[in-house]
Amino acid sequence: EQVEFIKKNFKYGFGQHSGVIDFTKNAYELPRFPINEKYGDLKRFEFILNLFPIPYKKLDPVDKFIKKNNNPPSVQIEFFSEQKNIKNLNCFSNDGKDWGGPEMKFDENKLFIKFNEKFEFRRGRLNCSLKEGNKWRWLGLQFTVETD
């Protein structure tokens, strides 16, 4: 019901997760980087401006609403075969109470992510970065977590 209302009345929507917009992103879940007094110094701003996306071919789950029976979710990301050095990807998530590294396994250009703990109420996030030569790539995902 909410999704249909948004699609009818808006062209784009932004999430509460960091990332770089590219052709693979959902127009109603666009990532953004906050720029404010806490996260707005010039060095960070320059870093953000120079980030590149990490496009993907397929992302599962498509529905990022986490209910009690699927917390933590299983995440699978299939990257394009042209993406270089994808196995050098580093990911961090805020499952549990702290940011840490989830378990990551690759099969060719597919990444399987297993979180260590359940996500807390409200918002769960996964941030992945990849250093490629002298540039950085970034992928961020957001989950909405059901209340207890």
Name the predicted role of every residue range:
Residues 9-10, 27:
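A generic structural signal for alpha->beta connector loops
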Residues 3-6:
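Catalytic cores of alpha/beta
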